[in-house]
Amino acid sequence: LSRPVVCMENVLQQGVGAKPATASKAKTAKRRPWMAYIAIVPFFLVVILYELAPLAQLALNSVIGRDSEALGLENYIRVFTTPLYTQSIWNSVWISLLSVVVAFLAARFCSEASPRVRNGFTMVLNMMSNFSGVPLAFAFMILMGNAGVLTLIGEQFNIPFLANFNLYGFDGLVMMYIYFQIPLATLLLIPAFAGIRKEWREAATILKASTFDYWFRIVIPNLMPSILGTLSVLFSNALAAYATAYALVMNNYALLALQITSRFRGDVQTDAATGGALAIVLIALMVICTLVNNYFTRRAAKGREIV
């Protein structure tokens, strides 16, 4: 009888001792809530110094007139009435749209290919995704520049497309934008295309629906939220691209990102007012793309929950 009594005494002593230990830990945790706030102070400093403060400066510059130095919309009026700036906005939007369409088609081809082709294509895309910016522009210059390898081959064998290809203009920019858009489009769109079910095709075939009806009345409406959300990401990615375009054409082609840089780093004098207005226009386009992506992402999530 003595051994059970001793064991019970040990259990009671451990239980009594455990309560104060647990209570002390809880009190310690309650006493140190400021530790969590201190941990995120560096993050807030980075956001304020490198995002909010420059954005506030850009917004202020954009509403201070370059000539009158008064608050107003003088800079925005200049942006949307000067042919150079309107052409820059249009060129950026047009090149972005073209690259998005071609990247979309490439992603669709990859999703329909056999597993062997898809794996090989994905392996190539993984290498392509790590090759962008200035190295990408330099590689295209070596291949298709005025004295590039493919250009010389085109001249030697009388291939007009290669011999007369203008790398330092619209065609060259579109080709390079497509190059760095295809990997991102494929990675983002393959999961969306994987949502196409065989039952949809079987049901459409039973109901004698044409291929056009199958795609435009069944597949695209069901995948539209995912597709449009991804396309908005691709569009914003191309719209804000700077390093590759600058390394290739510098300021010799009208693009929105290049014009913003030229306003702040002018050869003769700077124009922070117009540059700020152009930057706010670019930010507005990016915000629209982000809102579109968020909206369609939520719709796609609701659709998956319903299914």
Residue map of PLM features:
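C-terminal transmembrane helix and the adjacent membrane-cytosol boundary/short C-terminal tail
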Residues: 7-12, 19, 37-39, 53, ...
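A short amphipathic helical element positioned immediately N-terminal to and/or at the very start
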Residues: 71-80
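Short, Lys/Arg-rich, polar N-terminal cytosolic tail immediately upstream
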Residues: 3-31
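Cytoplasmic juxtamembrane regions at transmembrane-helix boundaries
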Residues: 108-124, 192-213, 301-307
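Amphipathic cytosolic juxtamembrane alpha-helices at the membrane-cytosol interface
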Residues: 28-33, 170-172, 196-229
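Glycine-rich helix-loop "coupling/hinge" segments at transmembrane-helix boundaries
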Residues: 65-69, 243-270
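Loop-to-transmembrane helix entry/capping segments in MFS-fold secondary transporters
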Residues: 119, 204, 270-276
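Membrane-water interface segments at the C-terminal ends of transmembrane alpha-helices
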Residues: 32-65, 81-163, 168-193, 222, ...
